[in-house]
Amino acid sequence: YKYMLGLRNRQPQLRVSGMSYRINTEEAQALAAKLRRSAVTVLNNYFDVLPLAPVEGDIAVLSIGEKEADAPFVEAMKKNAGIVHFHLPWNADEALWQEVQGQLAAFRRVVISITGSAYVSDRDVAFLEGLNLRAPLVYTFFTSYRTLQPLMPALAKSSAVVLAHSAETDLQQYVADVLFAKKPASGRMSMSIGKLFPAGTGCMIEPGMKPGKTVPEDYGMKSYVLQSIDAVARKGLEAGAYPGCRVLVWKDGLPVYDKGFGTHSDKDTTTVRSSDL
């Protein structure tokens, strides 16, 4: 075949000079930016905590990593809402962690921005896992998926996780707009990240979406705890313990959790509705 393809003849050498200019055209850069935006993945969004409501003074952004590494994201967040910004380096001492945690206690929503790190210390994991605030926690990762793996104990207690895969300026600005449903996100994971995020995981964010009406943290409860009810209810369905059920959790006279599962009976295919008792 090498004779048929002409490979026996000496091929002209590739011209290396000026190659970067021939490759990095405006069209190529626009395509790369489009692909980056398409890959943004919302891994979970319990009780529709996203999109955030742009209420002045309600939102804190905690940046963890090298200082200014997520400056485009922080600036874009400031344009969307009156946020208050905090910063911590990786492996910060305990006194600094505790000081920041005390300051975060005053906010209704907390966004934790993670920028690249080759090493996540046990101290970082312990702090984030033990971060006990009244606000739901929204994580944004401007890193590869690998950074999520050591932080799984903390992410299991989050309300939303957004994976951007990288940290280009335009991408950071885009993710900030996704958090307020000004831009869409429809990415899906092609592979599993631990047991928490199986392959295919991804939540849709569409422009114009409204924030969830009831977020458990606003009533002194935890979204990740109530969300686990879903798995318990579905496990009972799979085991044949019941054909269907409705789970209602009230707090301060309001339904914080209200979901139906399955059907009325084994012979009745009517799905359980909000009006069923």
Predicted segments, located by residue:
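Short, conserved catalytic-motif segment at the N-terminal edge
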Residues: 219-277
